[in-house]
Amino acid sequence: MGASQSTNGPGQKTTSVEELSKRLAYRFANKCFTPLELTHLKDNFFSRALDQGGIRYWNEEILSEFLGIPDGAGSAAYVTSDGSLDAGPVIFRMVSYLGAFPFHNTMAPSVLTFEAMVKVIVLLTERYGKVLKRGRKDRVKLLFGSLADVGRRDIVVQLQEAAEDSLELIGEAGPGSDRTFTHPTGFSVDKPAHDDDGEEDDDDLALAALESLDAIEIFKHDQRIDKTVYESKISINTFRRLLAFLMVTAPLRPLGTISKYTTGLSSSILETVNEQVESILAALALDDLEGGIGYKSFSELISTSLPYLFDPLTPLFEHLLFSKNLDVTRKRHSQSQNDPAAKPVPTPPSTPPSSPPLSPVILNGGFDSSILNPTLLSHLSFFLSTTAQIPNIFRNRTRLHPVFSSTEHGESLTSFSHHVMTWQAPSILLIKGVVTSESDEEQITTIGAYLPQPWKQSSSNSSRRSSDVPDQSTLPCLFELSPVHTVLQGSPSLSSLKPNMPITYFSTKTGIAIGCQIPPPSRKSLGADFLPKPSGGGSLLIDPALEVATLVISDGLNGEGVFLPPGISAHSASKSVSCTTLAASTASISASNHNTTKSISIYSLEVWGIIPSQSLSVQLDSPGSFVEKQDAITQQRAQWDFEAREAERRKVINMKVGVGELEEHSGRALLEMAGIVGDSQYSGLRHLR
């Protein structure tokens, strides 16, 4: 690994691949870290590094201990006997691969030196956007390579062969030799393969980083070592262990304590985690994945339905950028105690702050959820975006307010209307129930929808121009959390849909409809012609009694609609030149277009209101003046107070329409028949349409 060289010709300077890798790491450090962060990183690394032959490095034990990653024995199970998650070997395999960037054929697995650690931190945190040409797309490729463990030869044998090949090739190369570059080969998984998915090679993402180092030719030769096709995959067990680790650490904040989430977990929590992990694995159709998960399946899953899966790695590896040994605040506090006369010195603003207390995402009050729990919330955070600036719901301090529960408030559209129609903010609908199969077996199912607009304004999407490419937080989302993870993203062409295709629709006669085509009102409409029709990639219908929900998922049979078919992202769909083109592309997804319909017997239905990080935001109302916007909770309570006052006002209406007692009784009878007073007074039921 340390003998690879490039020979540019007689009398010219010889540059090794390792030297180029170090120079690239320094570029990464200067571009992605502040001087203070580098100081903390150096202290953390070198104070714990092992020394062998003058090389300072970290091994798996040091990395796992510092980051607090469970590193138990045994590879068969991802949950150890003490309730911890055994993710240490998986994480170390990832960093050993990424530390060799971009010379994976030559250097992977790399020794975890300081230079390798710099590249690992950049690539595993959100700083990767500064160095990767295509951002998230390139990162998915790197993450797949770091996890792929099927199709690789035994590492020990491979390194021995690499060392022997290196010595032999260096001896053969000379001034008159045709061999321009000599270096050992790395993982066989990294040898170029002729994939059928149409993806570009990884050349672009590394060429941009190397163009200023005069190393492009070396990199290209590194990629041309062997043109033999090698199939590489991620083993199911490796991905399962990583998913479980990411599931429990999703709420991790910068400088937070990871052991708080990975140790001492109860059997019920571990069971819930396992259910959600198996749901995600089920989305990969494991029966068709013999030997592991290929790149195409991995890329489609991450890109279309789990875009924020690896977000927990950012706060995890940013622990390396803060050293307790250099905690200026603690040192000065200790000095002030020893010297009472010493004046307090303000902490420099560049000192890494301690992690602020984590505000609860799920707010108390209203009702105790029978659906939403911390594990389910972690699952939602992998694909649900509530703000454009910081998509992850744990990082952007989004809070969920309990709005409606069929268990607490009753299975009534009247109660649903009272609680939900008065909520003037985005919301999440969750449904838990059972699906009965043809063999009479009942299977627990959890589905839901993210609705970025208040229910009353379901048809007010005409303000969004069709030429704009909206972010995920402004588009609706229909999803299934279990038993099979499925995400149907909102169409970026909502503004061009017909008026009879609202995001949500509410009627006391037909119930609740999401992503459906609504028939025009007509006195002659009877039976099935009167019911909302499924459209687009997916639809959800709930009967007026809130007892049965019907989820329809289509591969393109229902044409255009509010939601895209599964496997299509809003970003890729936005490239379509028109709705006609989009409909044609969605219709060609499956060779045999079909609908999948699930009839779910509802156990519980809940609506959770989404509150942004700042419940009282200030916006510019007019030049020189500001208005304070009320948060959704205050608005809802004000609406309820108004309705209560109106009901009370109607009760005290002067019913004396005449001067005699007979006229008074007649007037009251008229008011009762009108439903203004008495037991039959207006219940306040609202219609969305």
UniProtKB/Swiss-Prot annotation:
Q: Gene for this protein?
A: RTC5
InterPro entries linked: TLDc_dom
This protein's source sits in the domain of life called Eukaryota
Q: Where is this region: Disordered?
A: 173-201, 332-359
Which protein are we looking at? Restriction of telomere capping protein 5
* Native species: Paracoccidioides brasiliensis (strain Pb18)
Q: Which parts pass through the membrane?
A: none
One Pfam family linked to the record: TLD
Q: Which residues form the TLDc domain?
A: 370-611
Function text: May be involved in a process influencing telomere capping.
Cite a GO CC annotation.
cytoplasm
SMART domains documented for this protein: TLDc (SM00584)
Locate the compositionally biased regions of type Pro residues.
343-359
Where, per UniProt, does this protein localize?
Answer: Cytoplasm
- Which terms are listed as keywords in the entry? Cytoplasm
Query: Which family is it part of?
Result: Belongs to the RTC5 family.
